[in-house]
C-alpha cells in the first residue's frame, strides 16, 4: 500500500523524535520555502584576499554618484569593500617620532624604543621615515610603510615586533623611525575577566585568584552608519570617526576625526553605540560620556544627541536641538536599531522607543518592554517596522508591543550557547527568503559556529504553533542584507589561518575573515578559486503506521509493526544527486537500524527504490555531500503494510 506522509515546515526539537508528529527534527544548511524543505544557496568569496582579524560589523551605503561601498569593521581594522577590492581606511593615532630600533643576531624580534609609546600587545603600528643603524642585516625597505603587530611590551618605553626573517647582526639600539599606531579596537573574542578589577578592594587574600568572575571583557566592536555619503564609524567604548565617500579620491583617505566638513572632534570620546536618526539626521551616542572628552564619565545608560544636521555640535542651546537623556531600567545600553520613524533602544533588561517630538525636548523616550533585554549589540534586526531579537531569556519581537516568541528549537539553542559571549552573536536579515538568522557560539566554541533561523514569512503563511524555525552549524560573524548589492554579504572567521589584507609583517595569531556573497550557486567558492561542497541534510520525526491518521480516530501509537517495501522519491527539483536514508526502530528510544540497500542515491530520473525493513517507527533523512548538488523535497511516499505486533 503506497502511503503519503506530509510534513509541516520547520524543525521541532522541543518534542521527542517520536512525539514531533508530522515534523522534521534536525537539519543543516536547509531552509523552508512555501512549506517545502530545500538546500540553501551557495556562497562565493568576493575578493581573492582574506581580512586580518574577525569582522564584527558591516554597513552598505552609496555616495551621491551611485558608487557602492561596504564598510567592514574588524577587531583590528576598518575596511572598505569597493567593486571587488578591499581598502584600508582604519584611523591612525598621532604619529610618534624619533624612535630607535635594536636587533639580535639570529632572531626576527626587533625591539623599538620610544618613551610613553602607549602601545599594547596586539596593537598594529605602521613604521615610517625609517633609517636603520648599520649591522642589522635588514634594509630600510623591510620596515618602511609596513604594518607590524606589537608582540610584547616589556616597558612603557619599549615594545617588540617580528620581522619576516632573522637579523644577521646584533645592534643594541640606534637609527631613527616614526610610529603610526592604528586606533585599537578590542579583543577578538569576549571573555570573562580575571585579576585586577574583577572584585571590590580587599575582597579575598593578596595574590589569590578569584574563583569566578562576572566581569565581561567585550570583543572589539564597531557602530557603522552613514550620514548621506559619509561613513560614521565608532569604536565601541571609543571615539567616532568619519570617512567621506564623496571625496575626490576617497579610497586613499583614512577615517578620521578631522575629515573636512565632517569633523567629530567635539564628539564624545567613549560611546558604546552610535547611529544617525532616520528622519532628522541627529548623530546619537548611546552609553556615552556625561562630560564630553572625559572617558571616566562614561555612563552605560546615558544618551547624547547632536544638533540636527550638525554631527559635531553637542552643547544644547536655545537655538539648536542637541540634548541628553538617561534611561532607567537596566545596567547598560546593549543595542539600538532604526525602525521606520522610531529608534529602538535595548538595555540588558528593557526596550525603549526614541521618537522625534520637536521643541523643547527634541526626542521623546518611552519604555515599551521589560525583562526582554538584548543579549548582544548585533543580536537584533528590523524589517518593515518589526524588530526581532535574541535575549538571554529567549526570542522576542516588537511590532508596537513586545511579544515573546514561542520557539520549537529553544532548548537546543539556549542549553548549548555560551552566554558569556553574547556580544559575538550576530543577527542577519535575508529578506528574499523572509529569514532572520542568528549566528552564535556554542558552549564549547570560542567563536560563532552555529545558527538558528526564524522564517517569519513561512510562520505567517502556515500559522504553525511555535513558528517556523530551523538550525544549523555554519559560522558567520557579520551580515548585511541585499540592499545596494543584489545578494547578501556575510563574513566567516577562521582563527587558525592567516589573513592577507592588510599585510602585517610578522603577524601571529590574528586569524582571517573571508567575505562571501550568499545565495550564489550551490557551493562555497574560496578566495583562491577552489570549490568546497556545501553539505546539507534534513531528518524527519519517527513515523509510525498511523502517523498520517492523527485526528481521525484514536491513535494506536506504534502498537503495530510496519513492513517497508518501497520508497518513491518526490523531489520538486534536484540538481546532481541526493542521498536518502530510511531508518527503523522497534521502540522510540531504541537504536536506529538502516533499512536494506539504503542510503539510496537518488537522481532526477529515479522512479523508485525497493527495500526491506520492519519496525514500529520509521524516519527519513535527505542529504547531499558533494559539490554541484541542490535539492528541494516534496512529499514522502512509502509502500508500507501492517506486519503484526511483535
Model-derived regions: residue spans:
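Small/polar beta-strand repeat architecture
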Residues: 1, 89-220, 249-253, 262-266
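Beta-sheet repeat architectures centered on beta-propellers
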Residues: 1-94, 185-192, 201, 221-223, ...
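Beta-propeller and closely related beta-pinwheel folds
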Residues: 42-62, 90-94, 204-217, 249-425
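Structural hallmark of WD40 beta-propellers
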Residues: 66-69, 229, 341
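Conserved beta-strand element within WD40/beta-propeller blades
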Residues: 70-73, 232-234, 285, 344-345, ...
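Secondary-structure transition/turn motif
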Residues: 74, 84, 113-118, 161-170, ...
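Hydrophobic or amphipathic alpha-helical targeting/insertion segments
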Residues: 229-243
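Short linear, low-complexity motifs centered on an aromatic residue
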Residues: 240-259, 579-588
